[in-house]
């Protein structure tokens, strides 16, 4: 799976799965356009892999759209940006809801729309991978807004695949289990919480960011040219049991 001569836009590229994707795609020859709200992350990516960085707060819809226009026409889009606000159902706040849905769902849809507009104008083709979560399939304590955002993005992935397919644009999603990133540490750092969750995985471990990135690269590649509208669990068998 080589991507020489191709360009990929990656949201949330500064950390976690997004950064792992940036490194892997660059290693395989792609030019990386990295979107992040943290300038230091963009600077380090530029030094490490030569990524072109665009600083943007994806909580701002207008800024998100402007950043995608600035990014220009690309061959691939990876929607990796995501946040979580841990609140119980009874304690959920509008601020938490707006923050999580704004970045995890609304920003992803804006990015898909602008990417698709540019691809259609260029004659079609290309591929998108949205990063969702097993939280969209199973109920986890304090993950109400996060689960809603990820389940919503999976539904959107299927609609995007249907509407963009005639233009030769494939759209898929990956649904990782808990992945060893800073975001996951906020929710799963307590062994009393994480250990019972880990043993529910047939492989008896959580995912590494690089493992999720490899699955994303597979879906973007021509090896998956007949795959669209799919959600690939990267979960060590969690959803199977």
Feature locations, PLM:
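Substrate-binding pocket helix/loop in short-chain dehydrogenase/reductase
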Residues: 88-89, 93-101, 197
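Active-site helix of classical SDR
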Residues: 112, 149, 157
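Short C-terminal tail/terminal secondary-structure segment
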Residues: 138, 217, 228-241
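Short, small/polar-rich loop/turn modules that mediate ligand/substrate recognition or access, typified
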Residues: 165, 170, 227-229
């Amino acid at each position: 799976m080589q991507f020489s001569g191709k360009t990929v836009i990656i949201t949330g590229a500064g950390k976690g799965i997004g950064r792992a994707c940036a490194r892997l795609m660059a290693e395989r020859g792609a030019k990386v356009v990295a979107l992040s709200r943290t300038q230091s992350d963009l600077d380090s990516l530029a030094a490490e892999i030569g990524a072109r960085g665009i600083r943007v707060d994806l909580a701002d819809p207008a800024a998100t759209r402007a950043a995608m226009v600035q990014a220009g026409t690309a061959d691939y889009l990876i929607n990796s940006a995501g946040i979580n606000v841990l609140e119980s159902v009874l304690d959920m706040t509008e601020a938490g809801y707006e923050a999580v849905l704004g970045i995890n769902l609304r920003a992803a849809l804006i990015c898909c729309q602008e990417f698709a507009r540019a691809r259609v104008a260029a004659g079609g083709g290309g591929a998108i991978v949205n990063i969702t979560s097993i939280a969209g399939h199973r109920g986890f304590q304090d993950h109400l807004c996060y689960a809603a955002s990820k389940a919503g993005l999976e539904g959107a992935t299927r609609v995007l695949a249907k509407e963009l397919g005639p233009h030769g644009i494939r759209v898929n999603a990956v649904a990782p289990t808990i992945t060893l990133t800073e975001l996951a540490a906020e929710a799963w750092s307590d062994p009393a919480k994480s250990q019972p969750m880990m043993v529910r995985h047939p492989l008896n471990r959580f995912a590494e960011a690089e493992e999720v990135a490899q699955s994303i690269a597979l879906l973007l590649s021509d090896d998956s040219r007949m795959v669209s509208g799919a959600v690939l669990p990267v979960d060590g068998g969690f959803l199977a049991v």
